[in-house]
């Protein structure tokens, strides 16, 4: 769920997820369209595609899942029905950490009308 993913992002990046990633670029936040602006935005694009493909088995009304941290690694609950969603969220949080160096504040609260050319999953 959004809560668990937010906690993963905070632990991986040290950044508050909502101001930093809530409306970043063309894909971070609700919805998403067109071409990702940079590597961080691409993390969100891949995350959106991943979640869209992995919704089976996880109740749409409650997508909360269990996970833990082993050393510095996120471990999704093995028998959790939403494990695949957890794996999507984990991959995005790690992607954000790996791309902190190229994070660009000019894409925070980016206007979606400025996004160009459609890019399907």
Swiss-Prot record:
UniProt-listed SMART domains: PA2c
Pfam families referenced in this protein's UniProt entry, alphabetically: Phospholip_A2_1 (PF00068)
pH-dependence of activity, as noted: Optimum pH is 8.0.
Gene Ontology BP annotations: arachidonate secretion; defense response to bacterium; lipid catabolic process; negative regulation of T cell proliferation; phospholipid metabolic process
Positions of the catalytic residues: 47, 89
Tissue specificity comment: Expressed by the venom gland.
Keyword Hydrolase: yes
Cofactor, free-text remark: Binds 1 Ca(2+) ion.
Gene3D superfamilies associated with the record: Phospholipase A2 domain
GO CC entries: extracellular region
SUPFAM superfamilies xrefs: Phospholipase A2, PLA2
Annotated compartments: Secreted
UniProt cross-references to PROSITE patterns, sorted A to Z: PA2_ASP (PS00119), PA2_HIS (PS00118)
Reaction(s) catalysed (UniProt annotation): a 1,2-diacyl-sn-glycero-3-phosphocholine + H2O = a 1-acyl-sn-glycero-3-phosphocholine + a fatty acid + H(+)
Disulfide bonds: 28-44, 43-95, 49-121, 50-88, 58-82, 76-86
Molecular function GO terms recorded: calcium ion binding; calcium-dependent phospholipase A2 activity; phospholipid binding; toxin activity
Keywords on record: Antibiotic, Antimicrobial, Blood coagulation cascade inhibiting toxin, Calcium, Disulfide bond, Hemostasis impairing toxin, Hydrolase, Lipid degradation, Lipid metabolism, Metal-binding, Myotoxin, Secreted, Toxin
Temperature-related behavior of activity: Optimum temperature is 35-45 degrees Celsius.
Needed cofactors: Ca(2+)
EC number: 3.1.1.4
Main location: secreted
Residues the entry annotates as binding Ca(2+): 27, 29, 31, 48
Domain of life: Eukaryota
Entry similarity comment: Belongs to the phospholipase A2 family. Group II subfamily. D49 sub-subfamily.
Function: Snake venom phospholipase A2 (PLA2) that exhibits myotoxin and anticoagulant activity. Displays edema-inducing activities in mouse paw. Also displays cytotoxic activity against some cell lines and myotubes, and antimicrobial activities against E.coli, C.albicans and Leishmania. PLA2 catalyzes the calcium-dependent hydrolysis of the 2-acyl groups in 3-sn-phosphoglycerides.
Official protein name in the record: Basic phospholipase A2 BbTX-III
